[in-house]
Amino acid sequence: MIIACGIAVSAYPQQALYPSSFPLGDVQLLDSRFSKAQALNVDVLLKYDVDRLLAPYLKEAGLTPKAESFPCWDGLDGHVGGHYLTALAIHYASTGDPRLKERMDYMISELKRCQDASGNGYVGGVPDGKPLWDGLKSGNIELVWKYWVPWYNVHKTYAGLRDAWLYAGDTQAKDMFLKFCDWGLDIIAPLSDEQMEAMLDQEFGGMPEVFADAYAITVDRKYLDGARRFSHHWLLDSMAAGVDNLDNKHANTQVPKVVGYERIAEVADDSLYRDASVFFWETVSGTRSLSIGGNSRREHFAPKDDCKSYVTDREGPESCNTNNMLKLSEGLFRMSRDARYADFYERALYNHILSTQHPVHGGYVYFTPARPAHYRVYSQPNSGMWCCVGTGMENHGKYGEFIYSHFGDSLYVNLFIPSRLDWKEKGVTVTQTGDFPADDSVSFTVDVKKPARFTLMLRHPGWCDNMQVTVNGKPVSVTSAPQSYLAIDRKWKKGDRVDLKLPMKVSVEEVPNVPDYISVVYGPVVLAARYSTEGLDGLVADDSRWAHIAHGPLVSVFDTPVLIGSREEIVDALKSMEPVEGKPLHFRVPRLLKGKYASMELEPFADIHDARYMLYWLSMTQDRYDNYLKMEKAAEAMSLDLDRRTIDVVKPGEQQPEADHFMANEQSKTGYLNDVAWRDASDGGFFSYRMKPAGEKGALLLVKYWGNEPEGRQVEIYIEGELIASENLSGKWGIDEFVTESYALPEWVTANDAVTVTFQSVERGNTGGIYDVRIVKP
């Protein structure tokens, strides 16, 4: 069914655009971890300097900024401002706090000044954006690569304006949003389908989603056409055909695309887009996600035969990805009412999203390392303008969005979060109470003005074998299976009470394709353990370029607790874990954690902060572990030594490391060999990075090459324009493996805090692939 209906004026734009959702203001969070997180996030949002967030927009509109722009992540100026506008709207809708509305109104008025000054509907903060947009309109697609993901950037402003109307009812923001959409359509109108596809090779956020929403608002076909034009067929067509082509792809480039595909499927009843969305969700949630619901490492989907990198890399699942996977899950649920989407939503919400907010100062998390005994770092207000700060601003105001849904006379309970629902259309109030998941009981009390008939649909979670339900103390005769909904159809009276019992059991989940690493799960809760509080370098991040990464020393897996035994023995030992008195969801496992680890407690991962932790555990029989120790310990020691010596490192061909190092390039391309990314340059082209010797005397430059390059592969390496090495790679080693070469850095180089390292090709030649570039201590 096509749901687009042409929305003119509505008291509840959220419900008009998403008919099965309740307005955030109609779902009140009651006392719980979620309500506390929401309240804390309001305090954090109010600490941000709005004029500094607005400065990039004013500058690009030719107006005088009222404050300086934030310096962190310069080049992506304006993206966090869009997220912040969304966050204000969401939290205002959820709490009614007038301070949030005051800020939202101010932002909209300032953005309106910017849009009016532009004269063409544009309102964005992309630095020096006019030459870009003019060039794109004239067909110069290559220009996007000279900017930092500009469509991704402006998408945040599109979403912010839409959300100010969607959640907070601001009609001026809606008008601005549609004018901005018209500007976007004007930019892409002259472009051929081939040019669009080439442009969409770069990250562009959720552009198809916002145009699909513009269509849902207006029923003007031009916006739906725009949404389809922003559909990257490289991904859309493969997903619709059931082909997984996600290995080594930047994860949060792909997920927002599919959020858009789902939205197009929803508003246009398009089966191709629906099939693509479902297959993508099944692929990512089923084979490319960790137990907490997060995905990716170093921002990329791991290749299926290298998933061990999930537990070896310091850069684990990115928070933005999970934010968008929740949007996708919610959308697919709206189309299908399939409980599996709600099960995934619950897992990701309880274990990843909750964990990305510090419970005291409210800082946001970028990466959640799954490597044993590593840790997370946190943002602070007015510093670190990361993408995950932007989505972090939004996350904690939306906890009420998916607790309940309604379809006709059916009320779906999707999440077990203490809350009070005001179902105005039915004159029904439902109050949900309990201390789930610390306690396995949940209660619902119905309050109606007069008896009302509706069907209460209670989610039977996939992790619960035997859900028990009573109405007014009497067991219901209806049965249900795990990962489904139990229906109670009756005429409800004031004071009717429904009680659920949700027995939880312990289980283990493996890293995808890596059975030797397991995570412990209890019901929907991932249990982890605190390892230590030592070496938490950069725990609260500053404005430095890479402060979102936990740069403290890595711990050898051989210095962490290992779960010894067969899988059956380990699961059996976990089944006998002992609750810790006075500490809900804390357990000791004396049959597994012994000796110096005997005092370790398993507890909800989302509750562990300011500490190194064990989220995944190496798990083997004693014989296998003894053999593994002999084979891998030396290699692990070498890897950790290189990590310890590394001052700065770039992974060529990977988006964020290159952006973080201010890459410049001409005649350059990227690819993968043996699942390792590379970059090269040809025919006099080059690529360069800003790198930091940090004053380290005797520092070395290490460059990784492929050991069997064909003819015509020659690279010249320059630092600050001075040639330091020239390599003819053709036939140099003649081996099919990677080779790392070391180059001594002159003292004048190491005395600098930062230098430009350039890889230059010769005329009619090619540099060969460069796979890793790092500056290390001697």
Feature roles, as predicted:
Residues 14-98, 102, 133-167, 204-222, ...:
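Aromatic (Trp/Tyr) and acidic
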Residues 129-148, 174-198:
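Asp-box/WD-like beta-propeller blade repeats and closely related beta-sheet repeat scaffolds
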Residues 459-471, 716-719:
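Solvent-exposed beta-hairpin/edge-strand motifs
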